[in-house]
């Protein structure tokens, strides 16, 4: 234990970081605006039923339906008391060509009194030392004399102190190609890929035997160089270095697929999955004020990754010539579907703030600008070769290559293409595989952490080729899938064993029993008899998707108040998923009711000052062991809200903090009450075990003892000096880090790597771990170990005259452990299905000159699915019950979006007899086939 006392006052500014002499603060100022920003008014006390242990509404539910849930986009300078009342505005000029030298811009159209108060260009940034944080690459603004890296790249910022001038000027310049000046033609920039991945697995004699070669056992393969911007893989050599040996097995597999045995069916297909916009309700925006007199910098932003901004913004500003002593950062509620995770937009907002000349500056995309600049889902070209045994109908091998278009900036492209390759196996056991991926740099708009993260593209393709294989083998599509399903204890294509029971077979079996599937032939005949001009099709698809990144981490602080309330503080951000509600409810398992006071996107963790150095994905084992001797070191400081990580990973930190408060606070208090009186009180005649404790309607009981109210327990806990607050930091590299802590003379090995405790009303104390047990760095090669399985049945009709697809009905079966808040899971299912339907049939962005980078795209051209596109009144879903009440909850936000894509394409194949390979499948594509 440390004697390191940490004082904490919620009524004062809270320092969260100091970088190069700049302090970064979170500022809970209790004004109208900051009530909103810091959730004092948005989040209501949970409407909790202690009998059925269910919550009636989201804790932000009333605010949502009453229009009181204010986003960063709604905040103006006048809302923040200490800011100047004048609100300035700015917009960016962006290129619409990326094959010619940029030579400047022409603002002659603004000569009628609409010229900006300030123009910022790359030369200003260079002079003042203002540049992107390293993650985002170069050229915050493109200098003259260079070819743009991508369509829509920003070249200048125009700042106005008057809204009317700003508004007229922006409209005056919009859609005019002569504003940006271009010089000589150069062609698009040619660059090496942003990232590559290759994983080879040659399994043993059985799925449970040791592998001959795999990423987990040996290593994934990296290129030895680049030639013409394509990877050069090592030369295959049996018995050579590990990567050479891996390439030897890859070469041998390729030879066999080219010259297969007679009893193999080999299918080769090329698939394409399009670029899409995540279409977040709130476009990117920022509002900031730089006060040169006090050298303070204020910024209001929506972000899925507030900790990333809190860490990177001070570094960016510290390198500039602007004198800044302190930053006040205000991350807000938002929605992004990945587009606000590590987005460059906050740094454009910071740039605008610096050049506001003392006036708060708001930089906010309209929807045209949002299409032109926000992070997109990667387009993928996928080349598949699948071998299936004609006799056994078992998969023999899969070779697949994936090319993801990362656009003009790297962002998360290296990990997206890796996740596509590692996720391609979907629900299937594949004994031999060679899966490679390349994330190319192109002139397209940036692609990044969009929902699906490569797996939507790859898993849909895998299930589409499996559907075609079943048809060619004249096998029942569900039976064929069940015959090839991965079972518990088998290995994935990286050679790792997934965690827990694999239940994809149960999900598929439920679909096989559904009338939509059992009666599909009759339903088809009946429909087509009644609708002469239409075709009817039924489709099935099942996938299981990982959740998490392989370096998940979070902070949670759970504490009791003397007034009988429970409070939670969490590093995770609420991005519309209901995470704020679910984490409040998680507290009820150990503390009897949900947290009444809830704070999210918390960036101040001075109560547990963990530090992180190095790259958790690329760290050597000896480096990790050396760094872990520091009891406050962790491989990863904090994760953004992404990768479906709240239900499982964020819950872990919350639950561990609540568990400690129960074990060292409420439980000893309960025992002290039950043991009061002569002879050991009411507890003495009974055998009382902590594991028998149960929360019932009126409080806590165990083994037939008196029910004690929570208030009574909290009162006794404070009287006894028991534990009233715990802060936990957790880390997961496809398994949880653990550490030894000595608490009350007892050494405990806990699944946390950082801990701070508060007893009664004392200050928090950092509890230094005695020893840490981090998952080996080799476990990075596992790729994934946590899965949720989802299957979707779909019925659709196709108009033979127009090619229009009408989705008639769909049914989805989900396996996601025990639910924290069932209504939130239902909402995720419905929303994910709509997204998948859009990807399969409607949503499409051209990648290059005709695409969103030209600044002309909006929802008049981009078809988001509407209610009549998604069978809104007929769709159904079911959720498999957990195996027991100990099953952890699983992430589902992304996986529910995926199988409906391939289910629809498979249903179209059932209706037309043609297996489409490119997404989306649009009416003209169908008409070509029907004609």
Model-derived features: positions:
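Flexible, low-hydrophobicity surface segments
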Residues: 30-219
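Surface-exposed intrinsically disordered loops and tails
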Residues: 51, 185-257, 624-625, 677-685, ...
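Phosphate/diphosphate-binding loops
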Residues: 359-403, 652, 656-675
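Aromatic/His-enriched, Gly/Pro-containing loop or helix-boundary segments
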Residues: 126-156, 341-348, 357-359, 365-374, ...
């Amino acid at each position: 234990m440390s004697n390191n006392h940490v004082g904490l006052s919620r009524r004062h500014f809270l320092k969260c970081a100091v970088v190069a002499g700049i302090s970064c603060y979170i500022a809970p100022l209790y004004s109208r605006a900051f009530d909103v920003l810091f959730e004092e008014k948005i989040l209501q006390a949970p409407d909790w039923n202690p009998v059925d242990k269910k919550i009636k509404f989201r804790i932000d539910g009333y605010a949502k339906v009453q229009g009181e849930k204010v986003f960063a986009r709604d905040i103006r300078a006048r809302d923040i008391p200490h800011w100047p009342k004048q609100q300035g505005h700015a917009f960016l000029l962006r290129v619409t060509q990326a094959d010619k030298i940029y030579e400047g811009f022409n603002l002659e159209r603004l000569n009628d009194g609409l010229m900006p108060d300030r123009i910022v260009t790359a030369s200003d940034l260079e002079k003042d030392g203002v540049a992107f944080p390293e993650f985002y690459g170069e050229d915050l603004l493109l200098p003259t004399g260079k070819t743009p890296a991508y369509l829509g790249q920003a070249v200048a910022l125009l700042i106005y102190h008057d809204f009317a001038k700003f508004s007229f000027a922006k409209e005056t310049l919009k859609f005019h190609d002569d504003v940006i000046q271009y010089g000589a033609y150069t062609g698009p920039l040619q660059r090496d890929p942003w990232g590559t991945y290759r994983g080879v697995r040659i399994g043993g004699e059985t799925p449970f035997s040791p592998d001959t070669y795999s990423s987990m056992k040996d290593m994934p393969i990296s290129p030895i160089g680049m030639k013409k911007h394509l990877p050069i893989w090592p030369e295959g050599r049996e018995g050579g270095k590990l990567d050479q040996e891996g390439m030897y097995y890859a070469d041998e597999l390729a030879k066999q697929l080219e010259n297969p045995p007679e009893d193999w069916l080999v299918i080769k297909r090329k698939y394409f999955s399009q670029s899409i916009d995540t279409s977040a309700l709130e476009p990117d925006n920022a509002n900031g004020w730089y006060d040169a007199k006090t050298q303070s910098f204020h910024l209001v932003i929506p972000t899925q990754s507030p900790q990333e901004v809190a860490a990177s913004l001070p570094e960016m500003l510290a390198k500039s010539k602007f004198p800044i002593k302190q930053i006040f950062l205000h991350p807000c509620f938002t929605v992004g579907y990945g587009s606000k995770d590590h987005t460059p937009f906050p740094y454009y907002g910071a740039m605008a703030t610096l050049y506001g000349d003392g006036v708060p500056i708001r930089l906010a995309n309209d929807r045209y600008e949002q299409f032109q600049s926000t992070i997109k889902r990667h387009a993928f070209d996928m080349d598949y070769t699948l071998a299936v045994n004609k006799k056994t109908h078992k998969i023999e091998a899969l070779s697949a290559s994936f090319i993801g278009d990362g656009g003009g900036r790297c962002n998360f492209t290296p990990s997206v293409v890796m996740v596509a390759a590692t996720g391609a196996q979907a629900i299937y056991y594949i004994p031999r595989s060679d899966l490679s991926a390349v994330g190319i740099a192109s002139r397209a708009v940036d692609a990044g952490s969009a929902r699906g993260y490569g797996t939507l593209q790859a898993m849909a393709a895998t299930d589409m080729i499996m559907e075609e294989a079943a048809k060619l083998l004249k096998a029942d599509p569900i039976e064929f899938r069940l015959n090839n399903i991965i079972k518990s204890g088998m290995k994935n294509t990286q050679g790792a064993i997934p965690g827990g029971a694999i239940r994809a077979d149960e999900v598929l079996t439920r679909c096989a029993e559904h009338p939509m599937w059992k009666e599909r032939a009759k339903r088809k005949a009946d429909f087509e008899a009644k609708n002469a001009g239409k075709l009817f099709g039924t489709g099935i698809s099942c996938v299981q998707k990982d959740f998490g990144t392989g370096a998940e981490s979070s902070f949670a602080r759970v504490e009791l108040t003397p007034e009988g309330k429970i409070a939670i503080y969490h590093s995770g951000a609420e991005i519309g998923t209901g995470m704020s509600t679910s984490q409040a409810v998680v507290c009820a398992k150990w503390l009897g009711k949900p947290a009444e006071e809830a704070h999210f996107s918390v960036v101040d963790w001075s109560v547990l000052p963990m530090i992180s150095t190095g790259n958790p994905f690329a760290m050597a084992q000896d480096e990790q062991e050396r760094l872990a001797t520091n009891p406050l070191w962790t491989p990863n400081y904090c994760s953004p809200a992404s990768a479906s990580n709240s239900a499982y990973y964020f819950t872990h930190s919350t639950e561990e903090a609540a568990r400690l408060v129960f074990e060292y606070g409420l439980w000893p208090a309960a025992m002290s009450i039950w043991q009061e009186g002569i002879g050991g009180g009411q507890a003495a005649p009974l055998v009382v075990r902590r594991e028998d404790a149960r929360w019932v309607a009126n409080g806590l009981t165990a083994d037939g003892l008196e029910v004690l109210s929570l208030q009574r327990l909290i009162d006794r806990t404070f009287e006894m000096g028991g534990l009233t607050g715990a802060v936990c930091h957790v880390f997961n590299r496809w398994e949880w880090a653990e550490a030894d802590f000595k608490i009350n003379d007892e050494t405990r090995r806990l699944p946390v790597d950082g801990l701070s405790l508060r007893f009664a009303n004392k200050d928090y104390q950092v509890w230094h771990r005695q020893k840490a047990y981090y998952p080996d760095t080799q476990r990075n090669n596992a790729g994934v170990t946590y899965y949720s399985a989802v299957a979707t049945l779909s019925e659709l009709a196709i108009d033979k005259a127009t090619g229009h697809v009408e989705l008639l009905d769909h049914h989805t079966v989900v396996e996601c452990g025990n639910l924290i808040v069932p209504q939130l899971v239902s909402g995720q299912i419905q929303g994910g299905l709509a997204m998948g339907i859009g990807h399969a049939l409607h949503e499409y962005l051209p990648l290059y000159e005709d695409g969103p980078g030209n600044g002309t795209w909006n929802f008049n051209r981009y078809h988001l699915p509407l209610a009549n596109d998604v069978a809104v009144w007929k769709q159904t879903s079911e959720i498999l019950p957990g195996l027991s009440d100990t099953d952890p909850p699983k992430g589902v936000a992304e996986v529910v979006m995926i199988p409906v894509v391939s289910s629809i394409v498979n249903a179209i194949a059932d209706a037309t007899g043609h297996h489409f390979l490119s997404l989306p499948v649009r009416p003209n594509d169908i008409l070509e086939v029907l004609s």
